[in-house]
Amino acid sequence: MNKKLKVLLTNDDGIFAKGISLLVSNLLKADFADLYIVAPNTEQSGKSMSFSYTEPVSIERVDYHQPVAGAWAVSGSPVDCIKLALGDLFLDSLPDIVLSGINNGSNAGRNIFYSGTAGAAMEAVISGIPAIAFSQEEHISCFQEKKSCELIKMLVLYALSRPFPLLTGFNVNFPACENNEEWQGMKLVATGKEFAYGVPRLLCDDGKRKFYSLNDCQRLMDEDLSEECHSLLTKKITVAPLLVRNSPLGLMSEEEFQQLQQEFEDFIHSEIRS
């Protein structure tokens, strides 16, 4: 690749979170892109595609601890970050692709409806820019950094190889591996039906008001696991087309999606051989 790509990075865990730093490390190691960060100045998990409609937001250039081309912190949601980046900061020189994450925790199944990580990627696609949302199942400490550099580069090149706007957004989940287990390849899947259901937990009651925590949740799974969930359980990295309608099967037949899966496998194998 003669000319380096222009890559915009964001997340919902905050600009100085471990996950986005790991993503920067991998991209620097691959050395095929100039990196720009526009991310929230505080954690914005669960923001989905919300944006600051009723109040102003600020953006401030910050010193970042890794050699990126520039980094800005935003006092708003992940979608605010994308709106400011594409609508002002880089309006005259748009990025080739937006990468969001790496999120601390899974964003598989219907959880993507809540995810600020996925929300930022969807905002990019809606705005005409290819995007990938990355999440690490369970905890960011499970991420296998030594094995991820070429995988992330391949996924970026795959997303850029797709004709816009057909399936140019993707939601990637890395499985959690234990006891020296390794990732067992990548698989293109449809977004699963599983979701995390939380029961409100009462914190206190002062007689006038009750205070609750809504962060207690667990993944609910049917006996008939989705392909996405089954792939993660068998330690495969899942790559799900990221659409506002949430499922590629609403736009194509099952046979057409199976053909897309085969094309994805062929692309990955050709990149590994090259």
UniProtKB/Swiss-Prot annotation:
A divalent metal cation binds at residues 12-13, 45, 103. It comes from the Bacteria. Keywords: Cytoplasm, Hydrolase, Metal-binding, Nucleotide-binding. Its main location: cytoplasm. The keyword Signal does not apply. The keyword Methyltransferase does not apply. InterPro entries: SurE (IPR030048), SurE-like_Pase/nucleotidase (IPR002828), SurE-like_sf (IPR036523). Pfam families: SurE (PF01975). It is found in: Cytoplasm. It catalyses: a ribonucleoside 5'-phosphate + H2O = a ribonucleoside + phosphate. Binds 1 divalent metal cation per subunit. GO terms for molecular function: 3'-nucleotidase activity; 5'-nucleotidase activity; exopolyphosphatase activity; metal ion binding; nucleotide binding. One of its GO terms (cellular component) is cytoplasm. Its cofactor is a divalent metal cation. Its EC number is 3.1.3.5. Belongs to the SurE nucleotidase family. Nucleotidase that shows phosphatase activity on nucleoside 5'-monophosphates. PANTHER family: 5'-NUCLEOTIDASE SURE, 5'_3'-NUCLEOTIDASE SURE. NCBIfam families: PRK00346.2-3, surE. This is 5'-nucleotidase SurE. It comes from Chlamydia felis (strain Fe/C-56) (Chlamydophila felis). The lineage of its organism: Bacteria, Pseudomonadati, Chlamydiota, Chlamydiia, Chlamydiales. The gene is surE.
